[in-house]
């Protein structure tokens, strides 16, 4: 006698113990639904299977073959003689970019079909469980009502998920795949073909000719991220404490003045600062007029000066954000602890060290991690302020103040080295993801949340 089938029964057991229509549903999708008079649902499953196999033969197999080879015939020109006249004609060839994209799209299409196939098996199992328990098999209208009520959220997510697959997952996988090809300025598509080269691009970045650029930029990127995050966090808290000092007059006015920088678009502030700090800008002109300097200070043209200038300008932009968050936290701190500490004779510094700062850090720890990762990928400050300059002849397609993310941009737009840019993108993600996980799981915010 066959065992009872439930909605959680493993599919291997369902195939072994199931009825003939359930077993055949593993080969012919929707058969169990058709046998149980769910004609609409069964036909949809069956048509999905037929459409997949037709597409598999006509489109998917050639697309997967093209993704493996990335093309065999280059586009070019040939001489053709017509009525004794030699003409130059274009020779059609393969496009490695399109072959890779179509191949990846075919894999995603196969994954979607695999999910539909799994839904077919779950439906067959559910029908058998209903029949064994003596319950009524719902028709299509009743199934649709269930979808519109209990699983309405799944229906709403269908179109967004398709959009995510097409416009997020597919480009992301495409970018990752480029890291394993030789798609660079020597192999410009579609004119030339590029090939799979394995991990050679990673070796070129980490050990080859690019290592002399990658590791100095990685070091500067981490220094910048730490300095930018720490300065805006510390001085933002200090400013918030000053603005919340008892007896300070015109608090709202002072707070508004500091928040004005937030109202100005960031790129506008950065471009203004770029003009303000250049060799012939207002600041250097003022310093020379006052005879404080003999010549212009290279705020943006000397590597060391430029790095300090970037950090200070970022403080100007970032401190007000931290000040606002810290102000909200300080205004909602329990006053009982602070008053008790004051009665016990604690100084303001001791109160800040033992009460105020720990509670601010507890609340802002996730935000700090986010700011650090954001600064690793802070494209705007570098691009609009220095453009990555000043130039450095020892670097490949990078300047002295370039971050990894701005270097990635130059490798893509200027150098056309898409494979190397893809490698840099993967390494940036690995660094950011590793730090985020390690920092967050060790933060007090995570430990307190996990303890609840």
Predicted segments, located by residue:
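Intrinsically disordered, low-complexity coil segments
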Residues: 72-89, 190-191, 391-398
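Helix-loop-helix
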Residues: 70, 75, 84, 136, ...
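A structural signal for multi-pass alpha-helical bundles of membrane permease subunits
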Residues: 59-67, 121, 152-452
């Amino acid at each position: 006698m066959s065992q009872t089938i439930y909605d959680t029964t493993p599919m291997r057991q369902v195939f072994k113990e199931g009825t003939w229509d359930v077993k055949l549903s593993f080969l012919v999708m929707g058969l169990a639904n058709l046998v149980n008079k769910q004609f609409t649902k069964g036909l949809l499953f069956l048509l999905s299977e037929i459409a997949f196999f037709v597409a598999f033969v006509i489109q998917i197999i050639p697309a997967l073959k093209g993704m493996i080879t990335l093309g065999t015939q280059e586009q070019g020109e040939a001489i053709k003689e017509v009525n004794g006249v030699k003409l130059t004609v274009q020779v059609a060839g393969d496009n490695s970019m399109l072959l890779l994209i179509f191949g990846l799209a075919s894999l995603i299409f196969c994954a979607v079909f695999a999910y539909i196939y799994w839904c077919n098996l779950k439906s067959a199992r559910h029908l058998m469980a209903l029949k064994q328990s003596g319950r009524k098999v719902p028709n299509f209208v009743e199934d649709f009502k269930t979808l519109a009520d209990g699983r309405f959220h799944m229906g709403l997510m269908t179109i967004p998920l398709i959009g995510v697959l097409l416009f997020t997952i597919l480009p992301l996988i495409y970018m990752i795949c480029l890291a394993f090809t030789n798609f660079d300025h020597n192999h410009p598509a579609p004119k030339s073909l590029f090939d799979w080269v394995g991990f050679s691009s990673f070796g070129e970045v980490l050990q080859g000719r690019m290592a002399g650029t990658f590791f100095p930029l990685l070091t500067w990127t981490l220094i910048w991220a730490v300095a930018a995050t720490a300065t805006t966090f510390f001085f933002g808290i200090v400013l918030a404490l000053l603005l919340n000092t008892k007896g300070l007059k015109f608090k709202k006015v002072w707070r508004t003045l500091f928040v004005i920088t937030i109202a100005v678009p960031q790129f506008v502030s950065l471009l203004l600062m770029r003009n303000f700090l250049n060799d012939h800008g207002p600041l250097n002109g003022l310093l020379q007029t006052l005879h404080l300097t003999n010549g212009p200070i290279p705020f943006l043209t000397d590597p060391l000066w430029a790095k300090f200038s970037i950090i200070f300008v970022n403080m100007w932009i970032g401190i007000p954000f931290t000040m606002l968050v810290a102000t909200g936290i300080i205004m909602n701190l329990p006053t009982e602890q602070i008053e008790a500490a004051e009665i016990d004779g604690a100084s303001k510094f001791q109160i800040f060290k033992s009460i105020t700062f720990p509670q601010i850090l507890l609340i802002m720890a996730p935000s700090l991690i986010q700011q650090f990762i954001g600064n690793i990928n802070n494209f705007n400050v570098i691009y609009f302020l220095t453009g990555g300059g000043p130039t450095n002849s020892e670097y490949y397609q990078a300047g002295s103040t370039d971050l990894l993310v701005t270097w990635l941009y130059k490798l893509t737009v200027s150098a056309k080295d898409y494979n190397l840019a893809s490698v840099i993108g993967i390494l940036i993600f690995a660094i950011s993801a590793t730090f985020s996980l390690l920092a967050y799981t060790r933060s007090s915010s995570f430990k307190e949340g996990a303890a609840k």
